[in-house]
Amino acid sequence: MEAIRKELSRSYQELNEEAEPVAIDPEEAEDEEKEQEEAASAVAPDRDSDRSSPPVRFSRTCLKNFFSVLLILVYLLLMGVAVFLVYQTITDFRDKLKHPVMSVSYKEVNMYDAPGIALYPGKARLLSCEHHWYDHIPPLKDPGQPGENTCVTQDISYIDPYTNKTMKHALIVQGPRDVRRRELVFLQFHLNETKQDFSAIDYLLFSSYEAFLKSHDQVKFMQDCESSFSSWKFSGGFRTWVKMSLVKTKEEDGSQSVEFRQETSVVNFIDRRETPDKGDQLFFVVFEWKDPYIQEIQDIITANPWSMIALLCSVFLVLFKAADFAKLSVKWMIKVRRRHLKKRARELNHIS
């Protein structure tokens, strides 16, 4: 009897151990439940098997797999487009850095800084220099004879910066300032007994007459001006009207360069003198500001690094999301495939 009791207690203990719960993965438990449901539906009466026949279930599985593959291909296409956008964005940014856009603006002024007018008369002699306003020049009283000189002028001599041998003599005249009142400077020169076939006087313009006066080395200042600015000419026997405009250009290193642009009009001088000498030439020139606007030019880099960073972040986010979705889709397809194989094996076992 005691042996029978020990054997019964041992059997009850084994049954209790088998009845204890085992830790199961939630996904595996869910798969097992689905498999059990599918198995139950497989061994159900013929009515249920008729309603959900194997060809219908197989077509549904194929359709799901087809759409999964299609979604993966779509997201791979989106990933390719995103990679192309990243490449194109970086390329455009580098191209904009190399090729800045020119920006032009206009600054309105009431008074200009008096420009410097450097004239190289040669053998010609200055007869008169006057300031007038409102584009009005009074009639000439006695052309060819010395007249009034109300301009601020200064003579200077320096060595030609190009030849380093020729001595050049320049007459520096303070230019007009009041653009609102249309201030102008009218100069008259006289040249007698010229042996040249053509006669003309050279001149150049620089931005500030005051800067010339304050310069410690005026000779070096004029040599630099002649090296930096272009020179022009006006001919004898005509009145040359020069209308100036100022252009300031900001360089890449932050420095600023100044350039004069001019429009000229030439009017023939009617010589009414009774006995003009042969070879006698009169030169007339007028300097005036064209308008009260200074043109400012600078290069602007249109590439915005913050917009590029934002675009790259959004593209990378799309890439990560697409990769995550593709990963989940592949996992789901593998799970469906395994479930289908298990179900098929169970059906074969059941049939056998």
UniProtKB/Swiss-Prot annotation:
Residues 1-65, 321-352 are cytoplasmic. Belongs to the proton-activated chloride channel family. It holds the Pfam family TMEM206. Disulfide bonds: none annotated. This is Proton-activated chloride channel. Its main location: membrane. Keywords: Cell membrane, Chloride, Chloride channel, Ion channel, Ion transport, Membrane, Transmembrane, Transmembrane helix, Transport. One of its GO terms (biological process) is chloride transport. It is a multi-pass membrane protein. InterPro entries: TMEM206. One of its GO terms (cellular component) is plasma membrane. Residues 15-38 have a biased composition (Acidic residues). It catalyses: chloride(in) = chloride(out). Chloride channel gated by pH that facilitates the entry of chloride ions into cells upon exposure to extracellular acidic pH. Residues 1-55 are annotated as: Disordered. GO terms for molecular function: pH-gated chloride channel activity. It is found in: Cell membrane. It comes from Xenopus tropicalis. The chain crosses the membrane at residues 66-86, 300-320. Residues 87-299 are extracellular.
